């Protein structure tokens, strides 16, 4: 669909006498354009209104996300407008989705402020999603040049250093979210944390909406949680942690909470995605300066990532967060209660953990991405998972992942500590079997049953949750046509 390779009106007399021109005529469409290594590339899924030409719609996306407005302006002549215009350079029908098109847009690097995700988002998604000629639009993927990557500090700790600090290697890390999310007193909250850590978990965590409410002030929570962490560390001889949620109404308050977490000896703090890009980059800098691991809860993402025809793919959010600088990121489970096609979720994990992402259409990765020297992010699998799924989780995601069993720990019929022990034994059994060459995909359930014979907590977990699944159709799957290079 690129037959309209060049439609720009370059004659200045005609151009500036025209008043209103189509975006393609203003220079925002160039079907012959070859993207440069230094361009920022974006792939949009667009649904034009009836009667709107897809190429004109693509040009409008390029224009409205760079320099255009609805009419020709004389001040274009005061700029290097040919360089500053984004260029839509390819439009393709989305396979199996009538009326939807993939449009590829290239942006010159000079359009963006270095080291600022806020500026990237203001340009790429700031205006075009409300544009009337489009029924819907979704940002599917982006590619950033290495030159731009190097303007970001990235994760403050990274997977390698985190494992060194924890002295834990060769297996996924285990965690749990304290439940119920809201309503516990500080003392009871701390007791839950202690039981989980003593039972074998590496981390316990606050949930996204526990901040500083009347039933439990944040200081009380921090004090009781760190008392629990220190006691569990002493009892088990392992480094333990609790994700202390420092999310607050102002940056000043977030820093105040982070400082107390540091004074109390915490190795990790947590913020929610909803604090915003500037706050995320700011607290990441603080974590880097204070040798603190930064856990990111993706609270709110589903409002704009879940529907495949409008919004932003989570793989793009994951890229922005790696650049902004987080160490942990919730990326989905594929087998739990939250939205997640297995291949698509693996694409999110690869975005976090690989130093170079190759094109992988089944996993939704449309561009090769070289991450330069940015550290890797530890993905987190959380939401409706239990010990009976351990073989699936290990098979899907490998070792570099935090597996968080909230209800699958706190809801154990023998108690919280038993729930933690069940998860730890299930994990250790799976890792041992895998290292001995067992195919976890086919033999995993049998490995669990054998381990449960000498572990009552695991046996009880399998009895209660063994058949629990969340088999619903995923709303966000990759649309692509297999090519010779992608099977």
Curated annotation (Swiss-Prot):
Keywords: Calvin cycle, Carbon dioxide fixation, Lyase, Magnesium, Metal-binding, Monooxygenase, Oxidoreductase. Its cofactor is Mg(2+). Its EC number is 4.1.1.39. Substrate binds at residues 127, 177, 181, 298, 330, 382. The record marks 337 as: Transition state stabilizer. It is an enzyme of class 4 (lyase). It catalyses: 2 (2R)-3-phosphoglycerate + 2 H(+) = D-ribulose 1,5-bisphosphate + CO2 + H2O; D-ribulose 1,5-bisphosphate + O2 = 2-phosphoglycolate + (2R)-3-phosphoglycerate + 2 H(+). Heterohexadecamer of 8 large chains and 8 small chains. The basic functional RuBisCO is composed of a large chain homodimer in a 'head-to-tail' conformation. In form I RuBisCO this homodimer is arranged in a barrel-like tetramer with the small subunits forming a tetrameric 'cap' on each end of the 'barrel'. Belongs to the RuBisCO large chain family. Type I subfamily. This is Ribulose bisphosphate carboxylase large chain. The lineage of its organism: Bacteria, Pseudomonadati, Pseudomonadota, Alphaproteobacteria, Rhodobacterales. The gene is cbbL.
């Amino acid at each position: 669909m690129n037959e309209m390779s060049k439609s720009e009106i370059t004659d200045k007399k005609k151009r500036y006498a025209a008043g209103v021109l189509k975006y393609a005529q203003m220079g925002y469409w160039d079907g012959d354009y070859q993207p440069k290594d230094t361009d920022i590339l974006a792939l949009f899924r667009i649904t034009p209104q009836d009667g709107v030409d897809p190429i004109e719609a693509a040009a409008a996306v390029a224009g409205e996300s760079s320099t255009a407005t609805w009419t020709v302006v004389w001040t274009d002549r005061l700029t290097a407008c040919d360089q500053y215009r984004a260029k839509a350079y390819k439009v393709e029908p989305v396979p199996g989705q009538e009326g939807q098109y993939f449009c590829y847009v290239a942006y010159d690097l000079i359009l963006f402020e270095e080291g600022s995700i806020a500026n990237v988002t203001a340009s790429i998604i700031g205006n075009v999603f409300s544009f009337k000629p489009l029924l819907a639009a979704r940002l599917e993927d982006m590619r950033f040049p290495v030159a731009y990557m190097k303007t970001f500090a990235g994760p403050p700790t990274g997977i390698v250093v985190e494992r060194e600090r924890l002295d834990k290697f060769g297996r996924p890390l285990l965690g749990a979210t304290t439940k119920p999310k809201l309503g516990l007193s500080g003392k009871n909250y701390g007791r839950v944390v202690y039981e989980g850590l003593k039972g074998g978990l590496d981390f316990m965590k606050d949930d996204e909406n526990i901040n500083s409410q009347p039933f439990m002030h944040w200081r009380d929570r921090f004090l009781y949680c760190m008392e629990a962490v220190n006691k569990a560390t002493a009892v088990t001889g392992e480094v333990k942690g609790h994700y202390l949620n420092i999310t607050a109404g102002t940056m000043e308050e977030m820093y105040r909470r982070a400082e107390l977490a540091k004074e109390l000896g915490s190795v990790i703090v947590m913020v929610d995605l909803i604090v915003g890009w500037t706050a995320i980059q700011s607290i990441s800098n603080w974590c880097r300066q204070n040798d603190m691991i930064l856990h990111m809860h993706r609270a709110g993402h589903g409002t704009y990532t879940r529907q495949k025809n409008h919004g932003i793919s989570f793989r793009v959010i994951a890229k922005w967060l790696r650049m902004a600088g987080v160490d942990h990121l919730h990326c989905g489970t594929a087998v739990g209660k939250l939205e997640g096609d297995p291949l698509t979720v693996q694409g999110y994990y690869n975005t976090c953990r690989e130093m170079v992402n190759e094109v992988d259409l089944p996993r939704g990765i449309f561009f090769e991405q070289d991450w330069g020297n940015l550290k890797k992010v530890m993905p987190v699998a959380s939401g409706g998972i239990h010990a009976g799924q351990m073989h699936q989780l290990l098979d899907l995601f490998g070792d570099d992942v935090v597996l968080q069993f909230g209800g699958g720990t706190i809801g154990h019929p023998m108690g919280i500590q038993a729930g933690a022990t069940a998860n730890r034994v299930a994990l250790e059994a799976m890792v041992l079997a895998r290292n001995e060459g067992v195919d976890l995909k086919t033999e995993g359930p049998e490995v669990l049953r054998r381990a449960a014979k000498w572990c009552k907590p695991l046996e009880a977990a399998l009895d209660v949750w063994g058949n629990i699944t969340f088999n619903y159709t995923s709303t966000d799957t990759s649309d692509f046509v297999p090519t010779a290079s992608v099977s």
